[in-house]
């Protein structure tokens, strides 16, 4: 299988706290992978490194590649990082949309990387680009909201607009950081259904960080679980059993309880 994301010996230290410890990870074309773990495990930190939003420690041998391009090496971003980012759609927990713009205009933002600069200054998008944006909204069930201001939408609807923007970008990889953390169960289901649909029908590789184990088991064939910055488990979701769940979550809770008692 073609390797889409390659992480080698990635470490990250914030002040004196080491968030990631020499992480190695390979993700293949067409996979939908859940990064799982309790708060502070390093899963969101790892995801941000994949698109170069943050850089790792300057440790020898550390390296991240995405779609065959270097994203960062030994704590330094690649000079052509924009080319890697152009192929990566990033979906944030807090939606990261422009509230004053319409739904359609927010989706068209996904085309900025492939639009001449002078046109972007005036928001001049072609008819073909607008048609593609409407098609992306249709894919996520949001076309009938196209001309509505995005600030009027619910959280789940805004998250689907963010996914449509990634489709407009023609991203080959989607990195979703806690996309359902603030959503009600029905909205969370719709968002995860949408991510699975584009993964299965468009062949887009999806990496999603989750707190909810049940969603990871239901939607992702592979789970990468992090515990205190280390890869604790990397394998089939079917083999992520109660014993592993207990060791991943409840042992962390016991450590926190002991710290409070002390």
UniProtKB/Swiss-Prot annotation:
<dbReference type="InterPro" id="IPR012693">
    <property type="entry name" value="ABC_transpr_PhnC"/>
</dbReference>
<protein>
    <recommendedName>
        <fullName>Phosphonates import ATP-binding protein PhnC</fullName>
        <ecNumber>7.3.2.2</ecNumber>
    </recommendedName>
</protein>
<keyword id="KW-0067">ATP-binding</keyword>
<dbReference type="InterPro" id="IPR017871">
    <property type="entry name" value="ABC_transporter-like_CS"/>
</dbReference>
<dbReference type="InterPro" id="IPR003593">
    <property type="entry name" value="AAA+_ATPase"/>
</dbReference>
<comment type="similarity">
    <text>Belongs to the ABC transporter superfamily. Phosphonates importer (TC 3.A.1.9.1) family.</text>
</comment>
<keyword id="KW-0813">Transport</keyword>
<dbReference type="InterPro" id="IPR003439">
    <property type="entry name" value="ABC_transporter-like_ATP-bd"/>
</dbReference>
<comment type="function">
    <text>Part of the ABC transporter complex PhnCDE involved in phosphonates import. Responsible for energy coupling to the transport system.</text>
</comment>
<dbReference type="GO" id="GO:0015416">
    <property type="term" value="F:ABC-type phosphonate transporter activity"/>
</dbReference>
<keyword id="KW-0472">Membrane</keyword>
<feature type="domain" description="ABC transporter">
    <location>
        <begin position="5"/>
        <end position="253"/>
    </location>
</feature>
<dbReference type="InterPro" id="IPR050086">
    <property type="entry name" value="MetN_ABC_transporter-like"/>
</dbReference>
<comment type="subunit">
    <text>The complex is composed of two ATP-binding proteins (PhnC), two transmembrane proteins (PhnE) and a solute-binding protein (PhnD).</text>
</comment>
<keyword id="KW-0997">Cell inner membrane</keyword>
<dbReference type="Pfam" id="PF00005">
    <property type="entry name" value="ABC_tran"/>
</dbReference>
<keyword id="KW-1003">Cell membrane</keyword>
<dbReference type="GO" id="GO:0016887">
    <property type="term" value="F:ATP hydrolysis activity"/>
</dbReference>
<keyword id="KW-0918">Phosphonate transport</keyword>
<feature type="binding site">
    <location>
        <begin position="37"/>
        <end position="44"/>
    </location>
    <ligand>
        <name>ATP</name>
    </ligand>
</feature>
<dbReference type="GO" id="GO:0005886">
    <property type="term" value="C:plasma membrane"/>
</dbReference>
<dbReference type="InterPro" id="IPR027417">
    <property type="entry name" value="P-loop_NTPase"/>
</dbReference>
<keyword id="KW-1278">Translocase</keyword>
<keyword id="KW-0547">Nucleotide-binding</keyword>
<dbReference type="GO" id="GO:0005524">
    <property type="term" value="F:ATP binding"/>
</dbReference>
């Amino acid at each position: 299988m073609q390797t889409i994301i390659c992480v080698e010996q990635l470490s990250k230290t914030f002040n004196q706290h080491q968030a990631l410890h020499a992480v190695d990870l390979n993700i293949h074309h067409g996979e939908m992978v859940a990064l799982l773990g309790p708060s502070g495990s390093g899963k969101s930190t790892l995801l941000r490194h994949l698109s170069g939003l943050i850089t790792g420690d300057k440790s020898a041998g550390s390296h991240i590649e995405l779609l065959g391009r270097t994203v960062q090496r030994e704590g330094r971003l690649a000079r052509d990082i924009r080319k890697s980012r152009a192929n990566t759609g990033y979906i944030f927990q807090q939606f990261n949309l422009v509230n004053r713009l319409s739904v359609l205009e927010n989706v068209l933002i996904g085309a900025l990387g492939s639009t001449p600069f002078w046109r972007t200054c005036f928001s001049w998008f072609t008819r073909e680009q607008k048609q593609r944006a409407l098609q992306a909204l249709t894919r996520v069930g949001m076309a009938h909201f196209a001309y509505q201001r995005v600030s009027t939408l619910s959280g789940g609807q805004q998250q689907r607009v963010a996914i449509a923007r990634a489709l407009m970008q023609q991203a080959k990889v989607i990195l979703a950081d806690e996309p359902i953390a603030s959503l009600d169960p029905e909205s969370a289901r719709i968002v995860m259904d949408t991510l699975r649909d584009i993964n299965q029908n468009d062949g887009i590789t999806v990496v999603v960080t989750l707190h909810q184990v049940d969603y990871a088991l239901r939607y992702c064939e592979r789970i990468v679980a992090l515990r205190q910055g280390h890869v604790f488990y990397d394998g089939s979701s079917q083999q992520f059993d109660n014993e592993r769940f207990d060791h991943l979550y409840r042992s962390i809770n016991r450590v926190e309880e002991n710290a409070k008692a002390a």
